Amino acid sequence: DHGRAPLDGIDFPGGNYLSMCGKYTASDNILTDYHESLMYKEYGDVFFLTHFPYNTSPFWNMKKSPIKGSTGDEVALKCDVIMGGMETIGSAERADDVDMMREQFHTISNGDYAQLLYNLFDKKRVLKELDEFLQFDFIPRFGGGIGVTRMISAMRLAGLM
């Protein structure tokens, strides 16, 4: 027993990305690993970070919220789980609108993402593969990832291992 309650009925703390930027006076409204460590110190082992401004993690197949953020900014439908002061789990809803995905592919990071791929693989090849991919029918879905070594570190910090 580590002095922790069982998970049933527990509400984990969480916060809106821009609210946390304001709280921790994050430069340029960008949270860093330093800010994640502050969340750990203040809120404990697990913290859900939500309502990311789209520009903080633009990705061409990430879905945008139909509702704008408090400052009128576009919001990505994603969340990060901060465990032990580290971003450990990331999840986001994926886009299912082919036209929007194509537009985002060409415009995210002011077109630099597409240009990087053109430089690495040849523009003709990249556009051919993009067209082939976008021919599929897309259903509402999500994707995510877990940093296993970070999760192990967080579990050790929490006394669970």
Model regions and ranges:
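A translation/RNA-centric and nucleic-acid-associated enzymatic feature enriched
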Residues: H2-M161
